[in-house]
């Protein structure tokens, strides 16, 4: 799993636990965002070349970034499954607050950001209801990818044991 929160901070040499965004004014600039997505796809491409599967965790609010990811995957004969996590704003605020209390996450999201984040159309993505337990969400994704029968037994044994 590669995520933009971690890559963004690595690019600007900001500690993952540092959430003082005012101290790093360029962290969310357009230039840093472009560089972050470029680096995300470069890392993903190296993993694909090595025969690995890759999950890219990002907002994907820009259609150009999504198209660049599709093109990169196509160059390597890799399939792309676009999933959009959807969640009631109240649950999202609570989960972000809980995550921030626990620490250990690179994300700078705050509960108040939930209502301020613009919604961007992503018609190619399959919506995923993330209000349920993590196991139920994984089941929903696996069922969507492989059908109600689930994944092949060898993978099932390894990943769900």
Describe each region flagged by the PLM.
Residues 6-9, 60-62, 86-93, 132-135:
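Conserved nucleotide-binding/hydrolysis micro-motifs of P-loop NTPases
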Residues 98-161:
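Small-molecule kinase domains that catalyze NTP-dependent phosphoryl transfer to phosphate-bearing small molecules
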Residues 17-21, 73, 99-103:
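Short, hinge-like loop/turn segments at secondary-structure boundaries
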Residues 50-54, 79-81:
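Loop/turn-to-beta-strand initiation segments
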Residues 75-96, 128:
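Conserved phosphate-donor/acceptor-positioning beta-strand/loop module used by diverse small-molecule
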């Amino acid at each position: 799993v590669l995520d933009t929160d971690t890559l963004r901070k690595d690019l600007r040499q900001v500690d993952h636990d540092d959430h003082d965004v005012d101290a790093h004014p360029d962290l969310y600039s357009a230039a840093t965002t472009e560089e972050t997505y470029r680096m995300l796809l470069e890392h993903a491409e190296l993993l694909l070349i090595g025969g690995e599967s890759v999950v890219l965790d990002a907002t994907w609010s820009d259609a150009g970034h999504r198209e660049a990811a599709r093109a990169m995957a196509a160059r390597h004969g890799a399939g792309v499954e676009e999933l959009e996590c959807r969640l009631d704003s109240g649950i999202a605020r609570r989960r972000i607050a809980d995550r921030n209390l626990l620490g250990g996450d690179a994300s700078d999201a705050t509960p108040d950001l939930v209502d301020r984040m613009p919604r961007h159309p992503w018609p190619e993505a399959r919506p995923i209801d993330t209000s349920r337990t993590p196991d139920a969400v994984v089941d929903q994704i696996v069922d969507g990818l492989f059908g109600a029968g689930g994944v092949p037994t060898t993978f099932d044994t390894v990943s769900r044991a």
